[in-house]
Amino acid sequence: VDISFFPEDPFALDKLAKENNVTAIMDCGVAPGMGNIIFSYHDQSMQISDYECLVGGLPKNREWPFEYKAVFSPIDVIEEYTRPARFVHNSQLVVKEALSETELIDFDGVGTLESWNSDGLRTLIDTMNHVPNMIEKTLRYPGCVEYLKVLRACGYFSKEEVNVNGKKIKPIDLTSKLL
């Protein structure tokens, strides 16, 4: 069972797993993962035309400046802020910039949260291609997106090495360590 994101196509492992009599379960965290399982369960008993997964790891106690605690690899969290978001609209694959189409959503007992398009559908794009509208949105406390856009624009999420006092570092490595 794999719960981490990796950029390669997870279906590429299918043949290798079958050849070695191995059951491989990829992308089995909260989302993708548990959300996919719940979606599939309901898909077996009803016709689904719209699937919207709202997901976010929010700390119980909000602490400035991020009001967020990474519950998995910090680099993978940062990837959510830089990797283009893929979703399905009217049976067509749509790709948007990370952190796009921000909206505020009110939740009883929680309050207002900020959401944006994220790239968590992963295998659902292929395995549930009969569902014409599917999207995943990440949730954070309000104000997070603008803060992240500033960090991204300043290069803190860059994978390109920079020279700092004679040492080459990738800004994303430093940022993930500090977060």
Residue spans for each PLM region:
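C-terminal catalytic/substrate-binding lobe primarily of soluble NAD(P)-dependent oxidoreductases
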Residues: 45-179
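Glycine- and other small-residue-rich loops at beta-strand/loop junctions that grip anionic moieties
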Residues: 2-4, 27-31, 113
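Short amphipathic alpha-helical segments and helix-helix/interface helices
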Residues: 13-14, 39, 43, 125
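Conserved, well-structured beta-alpha core segment at the onset of a catalytic domain
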Residues: 23-32, 92
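Rossmann-fold NAD(P)-binding glycine/threonine-rich loop
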Residues: 3-26
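Gly/Ser/Thr-rich loops at beta-strand to alpha-helix junctions
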Residues: 7, 30-34, 59
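Short alpha-helices
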Residues: 28-38, 43
